[in-house]
UniProtKB/Swiss-Prot annotation:
CDD domains: TGF_beta_INHBB. Keywords: Cleavage on pair of basic residues, Disulfide bond, Glycoprotein, Growth factor, Hormone, Secreted, Signal. Belongs to the TGF-beta family. Residues 30-47 have a biased composition (Pro residues). One of its GO terms (cellular component) is extracellular space. InterPro entries: Cystine-knot_cytokine, INHBB_C, TGF-b_C, TGF-b_propeptide, TGF-beta-rel, TGFb_CS. Residues 1-28 form the signal peptide. Disulfide bonds join C300-C308, C307-C376, C336-C408, C340-C410. This is Inhibin beta B chain. It is found in: Secreted. Residues 27-69 are annotated as: Disordered. Transmembrane segments: none annotated. Induction: Increased expression in methimazole-induced goiter. It comes from Rattus norvegicus (Rat).
Amino acid sequence: MDGLPGRALGAACLLLLAAGWLGPEAWGSPTPPPSPAAPPPPPPPGAPGGSQDTCTSCGGGGGGFRRPEELGRVDGDFLEAVKRHILSRLQLRGRPNITHAVPKAAMVTALRKLHAGKVREDGRVEIPHLDGHASPGADGQERVSEIISFAETDGLASSRVRLYFFVSNEGNQNLFVVQASLWLYLKLLPYVLEKGSRRKVRVKVYFQEQGHGDRWNVVEKKVDLKRSGWHTFPITEAIQALFERGERRLNLDVQCDSCQELAVVPVFVDPGEESHRPFVVVQARLGDSRHRIRKRGLECDGRTSLCCRQQFFIDFRLIGWNDWIIAPTGYYGNYCEGSCPAYLAGVPGSASSFHTAVVNQYRMRGLNPGPVNSCCIPTKLSSMSMLYFDDEYNIVKRDVPNMIVEECGCA
């Protein structure tokens, strides 16, 4: 590795990170390299020079890289690195192959009922707090994923299976289901009733236990109907059991006592009723016991050469991902760049660890413990909320940890 020039070594550092081989501490200056003829600029005036002030493991202290916006275009290698980074954080091997879209009417209804967002006239989805920034209050708390799965039918289903859903656990076998519900639309047909009376029915939702033959469990609910509308049925137990078995297909049978005689029709998968297609909503959490220490960092403003955070926004339309990522419209691929002189690395709070602070104190006394140099790296990462389709056409709302660089420091 010592024989590699700074620009090649920096590019290798970026690609290894995107492939998941390096941790977030290596996310330093993830920007395209300059042309071979462009020498790195000298250290800023007044700052100590030499290798001690740069991060040789990541291709230099900011001098060996150029920002994407300075290139006048988004570099292909940079975009590919960002793509791999996002897919790895979503635990996806590749981008979902969206061959046929979920009917817009069904998606609009689901988002509206969940108060999750709205669809604009141009077809784009607006989701509160999903603007590409960090989700508020997400750091240090348990991460909650929301999964929306729409009902399907096929010729392989048994005579008893009315509906089935492919519910993904997003690659996590230890998800704990906080709540899961079936949303079912009950439609009222013309029927003569006494004035002020309601139609009272009992809806039974049977869910099949995989591996137990014809064994079914049931959830019952009495429903008083005055008009057509949506109703929810708790199926938390069924979804939790599904996740624990490592399976994805949920088979349901819906039966309604007195529905026929009272002219009540449960709407299943009907081409003429796409806006009323049944769907399942799952809220699951995966606890994170790690604690982060808040540190303050500089913002790159064009006037400082010290370690700072550079903001950079990538529109998903530019990389052709707006077909499977519903919201947000883009990603803040912020990164860290700049030099790390010894006096900055030794300031309490700017180092990422106690070990780093001790090493820097040795340096300042002239007792260098070896060829260990400071890097400008993220010291605070935050979560990002995303709403997207997975391979099974589930709509997934997920708080993805450690997605956005919030602050940078020297370590």
